[in-house]
Amino acid sequence: SKIGLGHITLMESIDAKNWSPFVVMDTRWDDRDPKLLATKDRLYVFATSMHGDGYREASQETLVTYTEDGSSWTDPVSAYRYGYGFWKPKKYDGGYYVAADVDEAPIEASIQEKGRVELLRSRDGLHWQKISVITEGNSCTETSLVFLDKSSLIALIRQKGVQSPLISRHPFSNWDPLMDTPNFGLQGPAAELIGETVWFSCRVHKNIFPDEQPGIARTGIFIMDVASGELHWQFNMPTQWGGDVSYAGILPVGKDRALISYYDGQPYKDGESQQSDIMLATIVVN
């Protein structure tokens, strides 16, 4: 099916209640999945631009724009190499890191042959270089990174089949699986260290993590056992429809709470526009 032409809108607020939107990226293609990165002097917006008419046939490119004054934005340029998609850049030890996925396999390749996720590093948020390959195959894509301390990095990966989270030690050249493998896929993963606890969110099915809300899809909240990689379910975020949901963003606020944003949409219907709301909530860590 054909894909729509989206653009990237940034919203700002001084009280997290009243928001002012403005467009920061609008190319001739379908712009989607924006990610923010704040450095000392700039605010970067990375977004995936889908090139082509068909969703399955379209190729991707990550574009970047930035501001130094909060009002004027640079023209979007390629953030890295054509075909790579950035997922949630992180600041660590004076530099910036991002997991970038690319699929260079031919269309006829099997699921096991599709996909590769690489770890990239930048000193300024604009120029990136490859550090290592995090994983390959199994249609790997969206990968959330969380730094535990001065030497440990965990990657939680969206794949067609389930896989254990991976861990790497500085300088992050090699990756090893943690012991536990979840019994569900990690769709739209988001992980953050809040105090000394890793909180994690992804899209889940209510048949596995049941509640009394409508529909079948949920934005699940978990705590991670960093020794084993096990994800302990805590609760599901509120939903109006249980249709198209998730893609959370988690912002730690001190050591005992976090802001979490996610979208809550009506069930997908081919060729029809459906309502989708952005939700914002506070999680208190006990």
PLM regions and their residue ranges:
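Beta-rich carbohydrate-recognition and catalytic domains
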Residues: S1-R32, L37-G188, E192-G243, V253-L259, ...
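Signature of short aromatic-glycine-proline-rich micro-motifs recurring in repeat-based ectodomains
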Residues: Y247-G249
